[in-house]
Amino acid sequence: MTEKPTYLTREGRARLEAELEYLTTVERKQIAERIAAAKELGDISESGEYEDAKKAQALLEGRIRELKHLLSRAEVIDEDQASNGEVRVGSSVTVRFEDDGTEETWTIVGSAEANPRQGRISNESPLGAALLGKRARNKVTVHTPSGVMKLTILKVR
């Protein structure tokens, strides 16, 4: 089975690469030093310091594996490429909600960069998936866990 790509902006890929670099060169060393210091204290079978450091190490290694996996599947979005007016990953989309007339603008990004509070929604979310392939003036109905949303696309950039 082929895995889906992880869509990332250039900035998002750089951010994940920087995090991976920091975790593997700085954080990993600090945790190894904590483990060594706890071992020097003597009996590690009842050492809270040692247990805490080992838990931190396990969490760190899990995050490192996750980042490596994300980056190995990364497909960088060319945000400068013309979308021909169609919503795609990397597009900014302005919509109007039919129920109250309010407008919002979102950027469609891959799930690794999604942050709805910052206006960045995942292409895999119900809203993001419903917008993909649509154009300005299209009406869209989105089925979400909290109910049905009806909106009109005003602008695609």
Swiss-Prot record:
The lineage of its organism: Bacteria, Bacillati, Chloroflexota, Chloroflexia, Chloroflexales. One of its GO terms (molecular function) is DNA binding. It holds the Pfam family GreA_GreB. Keywords: Coiled coil, DNA-binding, Transcription, Transcription regulation. Belongs to the GreA/GreB family. Necessary for efficient RNA polymerase transcription elongation past template-encoded arresting sites. The arresting sites in DNA have the property of trapping a certain fraction of elongating RNA polymerases that pass through, resulting in locked ternary complexes. Cleavage of the nascent transcript by cleavage factors such as GreA or GreB allows the resumption of elongation from the new 3'terminus. GreA releases sequences of 2 to 3 nucleotides. This is Transcription elongation factor GreA. Residues 47-75 form a coiled coil.
